[in-house]
Structure formats: C-alpha cells, structure tokens
C-alpha cells in the first residue's frame, strides 16, 4: 500500500479478495489484478479479461512476502494498518504511509512544521555523542533552533513554553550540546499534536476517504497527463458523459483533455454546471446517461458518505442504477461480460422493490470495521503497572477515609440527638437514673474533658479523645446544639496557656467542671448533693473573695481558706440522694452566677446577687470541706503545685486591691456592683480595661425565667480568667505607679463620697486626617491615656497624634502637642480632650 501514487505491483496475488464488493466472474479468479487506470481496449466492452482487470480490488492488498507468495482463498485477512492509526499517535507515526498522509493533512492546515520539528528532535537524539559527530550535532542543533524556535511567529515557537526556549537558547549559545536538550520541547509539541491536530486528522475527509478506498488516497493523485499507462496515477471515476457526446477512452487524446479542463477526478466549476441537472433530479435520470466506471470503484461521488458513523463501501453505480430503475423502465441487472442487458422490467412493484434491495445488498454496501475516530485513547495508557497500581491504591484509600469520616460524623450527630432526647427524659426520671450515669468517687483528672459538655443530669461515660480533631468537632457540635444563639466559649483548649506548672491537668479539670450548674452545690444540706459549688467554682470564688473581702479578712486567713478549697476541689463525692427536683434547684439558683465573671466581662445574671447569697456560698464552702477524698501521691503533689501557684496569684491580687481601694468605701461600692447588671455605666472602681471590654462584649442571653428547666450556659475557664486578670492587674499596677500621687488619688476619692453616683465622663473629640468635622465620643473617667485613645480609632495604621493644651509659648495661648507614648496621659482643654490624627506618609 503506497499513497504516493505508484500503484501496486502486478504480482500482488492471483486469488480474489474475499471482502471485495463484487466477486469475480466464475472462472476468472486466477487472472492478474490490473492497476492500470485506463482500459487498454478502445471499446465499451472489450473482453472478459479486460472487464476483470478494470475491476481492481484493493481493500486488502496481496503481498508477496507471505508464506505461499499469496494469501489462500478463505483465509482471514489481517487488520489494515490504516485502522491501527486511530489507536494512538505512535501507531500513526510508526507507519510510513501514515506519516505521509498525516503530513499532507498538516500541510492543508498550515502546521506541517509541527511534525517536521518532532522528527528533527528524534533524529537529533539518535545521533551518537562521539567526537566525529560533535560538529554535526552542533550544526544540527543550531539549524533546529534557528528554523523552528528562534522565530517567535512560527507555529512551533508559539507552542513551546518560554522557559523551554530559554533553556535551548542557553545550550546553543554556550555550545553545551546535549542529546536531550530538545526533549522538553518535543514533549510539548507532541502533547499539542495529541490534543489538537491528531483528533482533527482522524475526523478529516482525507483520512476517512483513505480508509474508504482501502488504502488509496483519492486526493493525492498524480496528474493523469504526466503519463498514462505507467501506473503512476491512481484510478478514479470516469469524467461526466454529457448527452449527445461520445466517451473518448483513447490515451492519445488525454493530453488535449487535460489542457482543456481540469483532471477528471477534480471538482471544478465547469463540471458542477454540467452535472447540475443530473444532481438535482437524481431519481429521474435519463437511461442514456448511464455512468460507466473503471479502475477503483471506491471513490464516492457525493460527500454524504464522508461523515457517516461507519465506513461503508458504496457500489455507486449499482446503487444509483437501482434507484434509477424505481422511476423508469431501465434494467436492474448488470452483467460483467460483453452481452447487453435484456431482462424486461418486472410487472409487480412489490417484487421489483424486493429484488432491487437484494441486488443492492449483494453488489454494494460492504461494511468495513468501525473506525473510532471520536474515541480518544487515555493519555496515561503507557503508565507502568506498578506506578498505576500505587496511584490507584492511594486514591482508593482516600475515598475510603472520606467515607469512613462521613459515617463517623453521622453516627456522632445521631448520638448527640439521642443524648438531647435522653437529657429531657433524665430530668424527669429522678435520682435512680442519675445514680447509674454519675461516676463514683474518683479524682476529676481521670475523666475526659468531654464531661464539660454535659449537665449533671445527662453525664455518661465516654472514651477519651484528648487530641483527636473529631472529638473537638463533637464537642463543638454538642455545645452549639445545646446553647443555640449563645456564644460558644472554648473548653480551655484554645484559651491562652496559663503559667501553671501543671496547666494541662488543670485545663482538663476546668473543662470538666465548666458546665455543672452552680446551683447544685449551693444547698448541699437541703438536697443531699455533695457536689458543692465551692468545689465546682473554686477559682471564681477565690477571685470573688479577694476582690470583695480583702480588707475584711487577714491575709493568713485568706490563704488558709484558699488551701482548704483547693484540696476540696479535687474530690467528686456522689450520694444516692443527689438530686432534688429540677425546678426547685433552678428556682433557688437564679442568682447564683459568680461575681468575678461580672468583673471580667463574662456575666450571666449577676444583677440578682446579694450579700445573702455570698454568705450562703461561704457556708456551702465550709460544708464542702467535710467531703474531701484523698488521692494518690502523684495527685497530692500535683495539687500542691497548683495550690502554690494560685496562692501566689492571690497575693498579687490582694496586694493590688489593698493599694487601690480604701476601706471606707469598699462595702458600699461592693453592694452597688452586686445589685447592678453589667452595662456601660460602670462606677469608677471598675478598671479602664474592664470598661473597655464591657463596651465590646456581646452579652449572651439565657432564658432562665422563661424556661426554668433549661440548663445554664457553660461557664468560661476559671484558670484562663485568673491568668488574664492577673496580667491586666499587673499592667494596671505598673501604669498606676508612673502617675503622680494626686492623679492616682483623685479618681478614688469620688466613689468614697457617693457610691451611688455614676462615674464622670469626659468628652473626647478628634480630627481624623484633615477632615473638617471632628469625631466626638464619651470616655469614662477623667484620665485617658494615648493607648486608650487609640482604641477609639476605627481605622488602624501609622499615625501621629496631637492634642490641644494651654501654653504660654505662643501668642495664641494654645498649642497642639504631639504625644507618642501609650502610657502618657492626654491633656484636657476646656473639660475636653481635643486631638488631631495625622497619617504618616
């Protein structure tokens, strides 16, 4: 098979092709297959041998290199190479005929340089890197670079990445010729061919016609005028025979015809005009205008067959003659000998049609194998099996992990819903249900922190997942579903790390104690509950007593009480009579939110507290000391370290409170703070950092009054609050130490005279970045530092700060003084603080 127009040799075989559209005449199977495009005789019907020669069969060419020199009759024909071209690009480029046909297609698309560059790179890589070939390799590399890569407008250069072109340029300029220097560029061009031009080639007319003609390309003829009878021109259809004209088959007249008109196989304007009537009335053709053909029968007249899904081999003359007979009285039988058609037309229309269909099936429509031109082979078809298996295993494992994670999440969500339903049932079930769920007397640190997400009525034993991310998600889901619409404080794991020698165990302890309702320990003598509030909220009450009773108790007594409370906080004692009715506990504990959380910005319902509640709490603490349970030596040592750290913090807090609060106004201010809810109108006794925090805090609302059976919100981590309070108090103490004595004493004298009067506010006005209208706001207290002023600015950045003050340096009497230190107190001008904020360029 050759597409260059040379034809097949005459010794291709002496047996007929079994898949040819028409079998040979009986007795003529052994005749030579002729490849001459023109008949030898000068008449319409010469002889049987001439007629057989004109019926060239090239669907499956006979090759002389077979075992017997020919393919025996009835043997299975091999798959033609042109069908393998559709499998992959390498199959196409491994066949010389495929390369030639593909290059012809690329020339039509003006991108033949892609294929030439690919072969140039392959040839360059095959050159052996020896001394004799060094100069040759250098010249070849320069030629490839200059022709294909240097020109940025060329199609090859446009498809290569800039980094690849830069690498090749460096290699050529530095004379570092490497056999693999063009590999990356060749790979990029090959990818472009596989993605674009190769699929278009499989869908192109030139390839489909080539497969239809059985390995002959009708678009690559040699000019018939170049020499008839030499076998260089592939056979085609006869020229259109017009009415009242005689067909000239003489080879001598062919040059004249070629000069007058285009070759017969080409579609020209003249031929279109001449055949317009016949094409328009294809079903009403004249009987005189029969179409005679020679040579190959496989070239389609109508391009309708090009885009069909299956490559069919239409016997055009036979099919057209059958269609013609439907509307005329022409004969439907074609003979291959020299006799004329003499069969009269059929009388019955139905039988006529059936015979016509059978004839069409016998004479044409030989199906060829389906060409999957729309099917793309996978790009990774050449991946090694080991690599492919490893990649497949990894992907399957990822899918399996995702599915397992989804299943676990669904199970946990179902468990959370079941626990919510179970909590409602446990509240009304009584102490018999609770006694089975509450653990017996054990140290707190032996339990997982997930107990912090349950109330006393709904606690269940679970597995500990300390550092498992999924357990963190479970805790968050439970917390959100239990307290919708409220802020979700962390269980202590995400809070700032306290400076405790055993902060890990303490964090677990605080998380475990975080959500126990405070009212359960308030009346231990009434309900029999040994889980007293002193143990659950020990750290909060330490801060509370230091804050309010530091001046009423000596230092040694405070430390002794703290020691006793810490030792009691690590025991969990549960009686069988642990619960009274739920509504009674909640109704008695409406005002039991800890006071220190009020001062730190985490208030619950602090407005209902009174001194009576504090005394009851103190009594509850003294009762809880009787239920101490000894632990292991390690637990005792750990508790002693924690106790020592807490006592140090209490000393610092008590020392600060003694210096800042006078004994005369403490009790009045205490009662005032306890009966007032958290709001912006804080007394002067509240520190500036507390007031600044209170302005930004979103108060969580909890419907205690509307629904008494609803459990309270989870309490924040007390250790985190102690640590934060200690740090801020130290900063406040340092800042207060820098102030003059008069300024430190001035804000503390006002609350002593009248504790019920609200603190005095000061107006702060400032011009921001040259704006003509100032911003005005109120700040509590008479002392405002630059750091507090910066918190008022909504836009953060690098600014210079100037404040108006009285000065005798200039005639105007006032100046704008620049303030840079955050601890500097801002000057007051006419009972206001007037400033200017200028941006630093």
From Swiss-Prot:
CDD domains from the UniProt entry: Axin_TNKS_binding (cd11582), RGS_Axin (cd08707)
Region (Disordered), start-end ranges: 1-78, 217-269, 482-527, 613-635, 727-756
Cited PROSITE patterns: DIX, RGS
Cellular compartments annotated: Cytoplasm; Nucleus; Membrane; Cell membrane
Residue ranges of the region described as Interaction with beta-catenin: 434-508
Gene Ontology CC: beta-catenin destruction complex; cytoplasm; cytoplasmic vesicle; nucleus; plasma membrane
A GO term for molecular function: beta-catenin binding
A single BP term in Gene Ontology: positive regulation of proteasomal ubiquitin-dependent protein catabolic process
Positions of the UniProt region annotated as Interaction with GSK3B: 348-433
Pfam families membership: AXIN1_TNKS_BD, Axin_b-cat_bind, DIX, RGS
Regions of compositional bias (Polar residues) in chain numbering: 44-61
Top-level taxon of origin: Eukaryota
Positions with biased composition (Basic and acidic residues): 248-259, 727-736
Sequence ranges assigned to domain RGS in this UniProt record: 88-211
Assembly and interaction partners: Homodimer.
Protein name in UniProt: Axin-1
Organism: Gallus gallus (Chicken)
Gene symbol of the encoding locus: AXIN1
